Amino acid sequence: MILCKTDKRNSTIKPVKRVQSNRAHRLNDEIRGVKEVRLTDENGEQAGIVSIQNALSRAEDAELDLVEISPNAEPPVCRIMNYGKFIYEKEKAAKEQKKKQKVVQVKEIKFRPGTDEGDYQIKLRNILRFLEDGDKVKITVRYRGREMAHQEIGLDVLERVKTDTSEVAIVESAPGKLEGRQAVMVIAPKKK
């Protein structure tokens, strides 16, 4: 059966091109242009080099698919398998892999040069929790008004945070110079 399409302008019939399958592997009758293949049977054992017709008949007898695994090899490598199950397990493994990957986020904690001890301890607890979760922490000390005249007080706060978190974190970017009216330091969790 040939699919056709009529062109309204010229009233001619043109054959429709078949849509190329978007599968990663060629299956069964899609494997063309080769006379012999290196065959692996459904148990994973090497069956040697066989003709394509022999490989197709063996796959049909087993009620499975003949899948071209490595088309660039000489001769191409084919395997007898349940292709639907193969794709399902491959997608399932990819999902599991994606679940295991953690996106590292940068959390920000803001201090002031005159942050009280109780507030400091709460912010330090949050910093340690973020580091345990595997996130980086951006510590910012903001200056207002005349606090700019005593920048060393804010830098002392950053130095104190650095020493208090030295067991679980490393400094990724130390506070070198002010960025506008704030000093910034980024710390990351130590590798386990």
Swiss-Prot record:
This is Translation initiation factor IF-3. It is found in: Cytoplasm. Belongs to the IF-3 family. The gene is infC. Pfam families: IF3_C, IF3_N. The lineage of its organism: Bacteria, Pseudomonadati, Pseudomonadota, Gammaproteobacteria, Pasteurellales. The keyword Cytoplasm applies. Monomer. IF-3 binds to the 30S ribosomal subunit and shifts the equilibrium between 70S ribosomes and their 50S and 30S subunits in favor of the free subunits, thus enhancing the availability of 30S subunits on which protein synthesis initiation begins. Keywords: Cytoplasm, Initiation factor, Protein biosynthesis.
